[in-house]
Amino acid sequence: GFDHIALCVGAGGPTVLDIPNGLARGVRAASDFLMALQLTGAAKADSIANMQVRLPIVVVGGGLTAIDTATESLAYYPIQVEKFLKRYEALVAEHSREAVERSWSQEERAIAEEFLSHAYAIRSERDDAATEGRPVRIVPLLQSWGGATIAYRRLLVDSPSYTLNHEEVEKALEEGIWFGEGLTPL
């Protein structure tokens, strides 16, 4: 299953998809997602703003907004989980693990454990890269947790993003997004 789906179905005049659960938690219009990410400052490491994103991410659409949404999601995810870990560790140091986790619901606990696990893995990769004198490899971790996939109903070469700016699409693919061809939401 997927935890987040971004609907990128027309920036100028968005297409409303007639699909079940189109307004369920975790489903957002891409323009709303991108504006919230930028305007809240959630992507800034020193910001206390929070915008929860979980992996895997599916972006429905084939335009440049879909490309931006997928790449911004992948870029934001490590920041989000590392901020969560930093806050968690500070609260545990001040209060205790039991006190911090006492009021968590079952769902909150599952999400927290996921975020902490991913943040520890990212921290470990950063430490290993520094020790070994190599670049940090976060993208393979993100992909192993589900990554971000653009679901488009046609072929990549037929997508508006590719016909308008294939260089941006190529760069996004290099940054770790996946492009699913011939996919239509039910």
Named regions from a protein language model:
Residues 8, 59-61, 174:
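Short glycine/serine/threonine-biased micro-segments
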Residues 1, 51-53, 143:
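Flexible, charged surface loops at secondary-structure boundaries
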Residues 1, 46-49, 182-186:
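A structured beta-alpha segment of the ubiquitous adenosine-cofactor-binding alpha/beta core
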Residues 2, 11, 41-42, 133-134, ...:
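Short secondary-structure boundary micro-motifs
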Residues 20, 24-26, 30, 57, ...:
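Dinucleotide-binding/catalytic capping subdomain of oxidoreductase cores
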